[in-house]
Design a protein with these regions (language model features):
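N-terminal DNA-binding recognition helix of tyrosine site-specific recombinases/integrases
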Residues: 1-11, 63-65, 128-131, 135-137
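Alpha-helix C-terminal capping/termination sites
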Residues: 2, 59-60, 176-177
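Basic, Lys/Arg- and aromatic-enriched nucleic-acid-binding interface segment
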Residues: 5-64, 119-122, 167
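Conserved tyrosine-mediated DNA breakage-rejoining catalytic core shared by Y-recombinases
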Residues: 15, 69-107
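Short, contiguous acidic/charged loop-to-helix segments that flank catalytic cores in large enzymes
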Residues: 24, 41-46, 86-95, 111-119, ...
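Feature representing long, continuous alpha-helical segments
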Residues: 34, 61, 65-69, 98, ...
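Catalytic cores of nucleotide-enabled group-transfer and carboxylate-activating enzymes in metabolic
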Residues: 36, 41, 82-83, 173
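Short, basic (Lys/Arg/His-rich) helix/loop patches that form interaction surfaces
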Residues: 43-44, 113-117, 128-177
């Protein structure tokens, strides 16, 4: 207000408060990722695609903007015979080469090396349901601040899974291996 950017006096009221919530940065274990991969989703094409796109994120540890657009132009074989995904990350412009593990190869084969078009909000919606169906329901303590006081409550892990969980899970599991 002092800078003349607005003239809203409500911000000075005692009733005005900032509500914050801590982000719970979970990751999925290899066994939880396998449980998601092993689900039979053949009766729901949209869930099947969302699951597969999410798994590509787990197997590559890339951002959604990078892993959701992988196509045959990104896939090549090194002189050693190793199949890799070769891409330039959209956010940073970094060039990365990612080894293709058998689980990732199966998904690439399923879609003839071109993942179906997917949208982050759709994958986020379905992946929570898919994680629940896979039995990923461990209780996680989530903390938040309300009226200046830190509070906690329990949430099922499946409800915290989102597209970025794939990247975090891939990176964490590679580190732990």
């Amino acid at each position: 207000r002092e800078e003349g950017l607005h003239d809203n006096g409500l911000i000075e009221s005692r009733k005005f408060r900032v509500l914050t919530a801590d982000v719970e940065n979970i990751y999925l274990t290899e066994s939880e990722i396998r449980a998601i991969a092993n689900l039979d989703l053949s009766d729901n094409k949209h869930k099947d695609i969302a699951r597969d796109v999410f798994l590509v994120g787990c197997y590559t540890a890339q951002r959604f903007s990078d892993y959701s657009t992988i196509n045959e132009g990104n896939i090549r074989t090194l002189e050693s015979g190793q199949l890799v995904i070769d891409l330039k990350q959209q956010k940073t412009g970094n060039h990365v080469i990612i080894p293709v593990r058998p689980e990732l190869q199966a998904i690439l084969d399923k879609y003839e090396n071109r993942l179906p078009k997917s949208y982050e909000h759709i994958v986020n919606k379905f992946i929570k349901e898919i994680a629940r169906e896979a039995g990923i329901t461990e209780k996680i303590e989530v903390s938040y601040v309300e009226n200046g006081e830190r509070k906690t409550h329990l949430v099922e892990k499946c409800d915290l899974v989102k597209t970025h969980t794939a990247r975090r899970s891939g990176a964490t599991n590679m580190y732990l291996a």
